[in-house]
Regions:
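Class II aminoacyl-tRNA synthetase catalytic cores and aaRS-like
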Residues: 1-594
Length: 594
């Protein structure tokens, strides 16, 4: 038996293999002893097949089958036979056949696992992460990783067919603390100095364009030391792309083609020839987010003019201070319980809103609301007309400065859609969000900061305002959004390729010439040697595969992810290191009590 090599995968056997002699290897998913007859569900990467072990065919090896348990690793030599009509298992791809064992070899025993190795288990995620090598045996997790492999292969094939060259960029690079915090790596041979792990290959891919490579791509690991969410990891993977002698339309057309190719090849899904486009201003106005989920409606409605001048002092005071009033219309939800409404007040408070007003439209068209008494019949009629409200609808209002209204009402829109089942989980709603503001004002730092990246090119017509009014400058910046998740962009497709414009942008964000030279001098110098117009995009591979696999967290599509506290429960990383290692690096640790 030990001389026999595996010649088939478990999940590939079918009626066409009837009477075929096969050698299978895998893990025991389940064992059932029917007294003189043992059934084994044998699992490998391809799926599960039923193995039948009886003394007449297996001889002395029947005793081995009696001793095996779940997750034992075994090899089986046997013959495929058709199942009888009444024993066909429609839940298995191989359910029409079984393998009658002639020989059985135990390759390894196994302890009882801490959870069942099967799909749909209700197990604490930390336990799954601690025993990740067992969690990854589960078919759904293996499907996720195989989908990820298929996606990356399709990406590479597409890029190669469009004349792109895959080039690796450094992992140990220079710290340029603009944006998220860097992961720092101490240099042993340069005492007191540090490398940084790259947050993106941004600078290097621009230098490759200066170097004349023209079309670059890379599937690259990036690192950011930031607070984690369901769709964030300290180390993540992206498809990085850069092109020379292009404009934004060239980049968007090429990457739409890439995404169509990936979805068709990996999922068999045909996507539209052209994706929708909307400006950043429009996205914020209608959806309260620069990552709008377009699988449902419930757009934000500007109610400022409709309520202005009424007797409701709260709204009037906010409007007088430059604030706005917006609402969403939750169709058919006027019967919402008061307890749930009170909970929504707490929900919007998370996003900075100081309150939430509501109006329930009764069957007779009248308005039920604590604030209805502050509005005349004429005002109420105009409010209902502006909101396109009908009997049975619920209006939810937030009044504050525009940024708070957008954040609170945009989040409430998503929350109400989830609660009311308005989101079609099978729908794929792509859009480009274009024309981002170049800068946003940081109240904390009392200066403008780049909304995404200081290397983004401003629109040509806005360049003169870099020195006079940076807040009015828009960027040649574009994000691809799918179902409310940014999957491509980083909002920096078109880069600055002129030294004078780059200097003006650094000046606008408060970087002195000396600071800019210290951080980016090598790149600024390169711009003086004939940098071509260039631009690109980065696709978040983890997020993209998460959506394609219909998962809720990118941890489900990464083989060995970190927890939300950036730790690896399986390897116990990060960990303490020996004092000797620290001395070699010329550093010491000082723990600061919080």
């Amino acid at each position: 038996m030990s001389n026999l090599k595996r010649n088939h995968y478990c999940g590939t056997l079918a009626k066409a293999d009837n009477e075929k002699e096969v050698v299978l290897c895998g893990w025991v998913a389940k064992r059932r002893d029917h007294g003189g007859l043992i059934f084994i569900d044998l699992r490998d990467r391809s799926g599960i097949v039923q193995v039948v072990v009886d003394p007449d065919h297996a001889g002395e090896d029947f005793a081995k089958a009696e001793a095996i348990r779940s997750e034992y690793v075994i090899k089986v030599h046997g013959v495929v036979r058709l199942r009888s009509e009444e024993t066909i298992n429609p839940n298995l791809a191989t359910g029409e056949v079984e393998v009658v064992a002639k020989e059985l070899e135990v390759l390894n025993s196994a302890k009882t696992p801490p959870f069942y190795i099967q799909d749909g288990i209700d197990v604490d995620e930390n336990l799954r992460l601690k025993y990740r090598y067992l969690d990854l045996r589960r078919p759904e997790m293996q499907r996720n990783l195989m989908l990820r492999h298929k996606v990356t292969k399709l990406m590479r094939d597409y890029m190669d067919n469009h004349d792109f060259c895959e080039i690796e960029t450094p992992m140990l690079t220079k710290s340029t603390p603009e944006g998220a915090r860097d992961y720092l790596v101490p240099s042993r041979v340069n005492p007191g100095k540090f490398y940084a792990l790259p947050q993106s290959p941004q600078i290097f891919k621009q230098l490759l364009m200066v170097a004349g490579m023209e079309r670059y791509f890379q599937i690259v690991r990036c690192f950011r030391d930031e607070d984690l969410r369901a769709d964030r990891q300290p180390e993540f993977t992206q498809l990085d792309i850069e092109m020379s002698f292009v404009d934004a339309d060239d980049i968007m057309d090429m990457t739409e083609g890439l995404i169509r190719h990936v979805f068709k090849g990996a999922l068999g899904v045909d996507l539209p020839e052209k994706f929708q486009r909307m400006t950043w201003d429009e996205a914020m106005d209608k959806y309260g987010s620069d990552k709008p989920d377009l699988r449902f409606g419930m757009e934000l409605i500007n109610m400022t003019e409709a309520v202005k001048g009424s007797e409701f002092k709260v709204f009037n005071d906010i409007i007088d201070k430059g604030g706005i009033v917006k609402a969403i219309n939750v169709k058919g939800d006027a019967g919402i319980p008061r307890r749930e409404l009170d909970g929504l007040v707490n929900f919007v408070a998370i996003y900075g809103a100081k309150g939430l007003a509501w109006m329930q439209i009764q069957p007779d068209g009248s308005v039920k609301s604590p604030i209805a008494k502050f509005f005349s019949e004429e005002y109420l009629a105009n409010i209902l007309k502006t909101a396109e409200a009908e009997p049975g609808d619920l209006l939810l209002f937030v009044a504050d400065k525009p940024s708070v209204v957008a954040a609170a009402l945009g989040a409430l829109r998503i929350e109400m859609a989830k609660r009311r089942g308005l989101i079609d989980e099978n729908k794929l709603a792509f859009t480009w969000v274009v024309d981002f503001p170049m800068f946003e004002y940081s109240e904390e730092e009392k200066r403008y900061v780049a909304m995404h990246h200081p290397f983004t090119s401003p629109r040509e017509e806005d360049i003169p305002q870099l020195a006079t009014d940076p807040g009015k400058v828009y960027a040649k910046a574009y994000d691809m959004v799918l179902n409310g998740t940014e999957i491509g962009g980083g909002a920096v497709p078109i880069r600055i390729h002129r030294r004078d414009v780059q200097d003006a942008v650094f000046h606008a964000i408060g970087l002195s010439e000396e600071q800019a030279q210290e951080k980016f001098g090598f790149m600024m110098g390169a711009f003086e040697y004939g940098a071509p117009p260039h631009g690109g995009l980065a696709f978040g591979l983890d997020r993209l595969v998460m959506i394609m696999a219909k998962r809720d967290s990118i941890r489900d599509v990464i083989a060995f992810p970190k927890t939300q506290s950036a730790s690896d429960l399986m390897c116990q990383a990060p960990n303490d290191v020996e004092e000797k290692q620290l001395r070699e690096l010329h550093i010491r640790t000082v723990l600061v009590k919080k």
